[in-house]
Amino acid sequence: MNISRREFLSGGAAFAALPKFAALAELTSKGRSYSVPVLGDIHFDSPDPKFYHTDYTHSTSQKRYKAHLAEHVRNSEMWKERSPRLVRASGACLRKDAAFALQMGDLVQGDCGNAATHRRMLDDAFAFVKGAYGGNLPLVTVAGNHDIRGDIDGDGARETLEKWLPETMAKELGVPVAGTTFSFRQGPDVFIVVDFNEPRPNLATIKRLLEESKDARYTFIVSHGPVIPSGQTRWFLMGRKTRDVERKELRSLFARRNAICLCGHTHKLEFYDCEFPEGRISQFVFNSVWSKPEWGTTKVLGEGAAAYGRHRFGDAGNGLGAKSDAELLAEYTSAVRGYCFAEAAGHYRLEVSDAGVSVAFYGGDATTPSRTFQLK
């Protein structure tokens, strides 16, 4: 059954009125074993494609403006029924050992045209997702590119997100959060949340957070943009050619920590197991943008180390063109031990214990997992 615009919005208001949550610090009694429900990008929007976007313009490119309008129509179709079902299914699968919930950025579509509407969209989206988990489970999100997207001339979208995110995360985590890159502890583990939107990724800040948590059992890197590039060789953490030196140093630092990278952005399901000279990096890319009904069922496009780099989509070139892409991917090819690349949308459960770390994938609004990936 489709939900009406009124039902959709009143649901968000009801979720916003739920009782206050417990701080994360109060939940660490779950100890060394816990689960985390995870959503990838969701591009929260209204069934009415104009509801949040009435004031949006793109003053320098009509081509991009028309492309963005098409995204609003796509979102309105998703958010009439499929996307709410997916989010609620994640809540229905919540386990008693859940420590917090994680959303991988692009919480919202953006493109609001003014700061007030952008803030309302963030608040509505957060309330909707948090409500799906009952209102009491802490919800952590990371800055995505759509979370700061507005008119290229500036409509306050980035400034709104950069104020909203630290304030909201501080309330959820029960600890001070100074910016859009921060860390928190869950039992013996550390989660380092990185804002990948240029020019925000700061190597010194990430190095400090790594140093402060060097006693962690597992080091999780939470970044909207992937750390290991594949199908989109420009949109990844420190992916600009001007940041090659920093990118390589960051890769080395993460490998030394045997980091587990949790990412989004590509609207694909992706799994990586990479062995570098300094150590191992595991990466999982989550997608919850259910833009096509058939994406509720997994379609694997490539699997196994030999498939890495074969499936390309979106912006290419790392700013320089196809030859540069090949050179970039060659830095990673020899390190890849395990790989999966699929068209799929759904919700996920991260499972963490002394025995290892895994991700269970639930296609679409399913309540039983269709596949489990071992990250550690």
Residue ranges, per PLM feature:
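N-terminal export signals
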Residues: 2, 7-26
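N-terminal active-site segment of His-dependent metallophosphoesterases
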Residues: 24-116
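Extended active-site neighborhood of metal-dependent phosphoesterases/phosphodiesterases
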Residues: 27-28, 59-62, 112-218, 236-260, ...
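Short, solvent-exposed loop/turn elements at domain surfaces
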Residues: 36, 44-50, 201-203, 230, ...
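Active-site glycine-centered loops adjacent to acidic/histidine catalytic or metal-binding residues
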Residues: 41, 105-106, 144-145, 224, ...
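C-terminal/domain-terminus segments
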Residues: 103-123, 276-281, 357-376
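Short acidic, glycine-rich surface-loop motifs adjacent to enzyme active sites
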Residues: 215-232
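Histidine-centered catalytic micro-motifs
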Residues: 222-227, 261-269
